[in-house]
């Protein structure tokens, strides 16, 4: 067993069954070795890593346990399905974390301590929300 294993995007291109098998293998290796996992699949980090770092352009924006980072955003992530024509307004008026097309309609996640406006529902944050919140926070500070 190696003492250190570095893997870069190891699950990219794998089908779901192979991805699960490989993640289980990495988890087992992590019991006796240090595994450094570089990935853009945040779900893999949440499921696999006891400690993580979020980096952007070579700069470390956050280190810690994934669940602790997620807990910091508790009660501050809001979701709403909007019209494509309204996206620009939401980008200007709110701290937009992400936009995802669901059945052709944009669904946005907004970071806010309070309900941004009528129609938003509070959702449980995930590591993707943490990632985008840290990127936006870093961009504002720069």
Segments (PLM) and residue ranges:
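Catalytic Walker B motif of ABC-type/P-loop ATPase nucleotide-binding domains
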Residues: 5-9, 14
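ABC transporter nucleotide-binding domain
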Residues: 22-109
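C-terminal coupling/interaction segments
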Residues: 98-142
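Helix N-cap at the start of a conserved alpha-helix in ABC-type nucleotide-binding domains
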Residues: 16-18
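A short, proline-enriched helix->beta-strand linker immediately N-terminal to the Walker B motif
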Residues: 1-3, 32
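Extended interaction regions within the primary functional domain
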Residues: 1, 8, 117
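Residue-level recognition of hydrophobic positions within alpha-helical transmembrane segments
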Residues: 14, 40, 124-125
């Amino acid at each position: 067993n190696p003492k250190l294993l570095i893997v870069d995007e190891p699950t990219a291109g794998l089908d779901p069954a192979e991805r699960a098998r490989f993640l289980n293998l990495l988890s087992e290796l992590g019991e006796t070795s240090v595994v450094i996992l570089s990935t853009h699949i945040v779900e893999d980090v949440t499921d696999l890593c006891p400690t993580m770092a979020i980096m952007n352009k070579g700069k470390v924006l956050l280190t810690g346990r994934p669940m602790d980072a997620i807990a910091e955003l508790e009660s501050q992530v809001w979701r709403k399905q909007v019209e494509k024509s309204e996206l620009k307004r939401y980008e200007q008026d709110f701290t937009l974390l992400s936009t995802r097309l669901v059945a052709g309609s944009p669904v946005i996640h907004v970071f806010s301590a309070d309900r941004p406006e009528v129609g938003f529902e509070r959702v449980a944050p995930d590591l993707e929300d943490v990632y985008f919140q840290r990127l936006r926070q870093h961009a504002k500070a720069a």
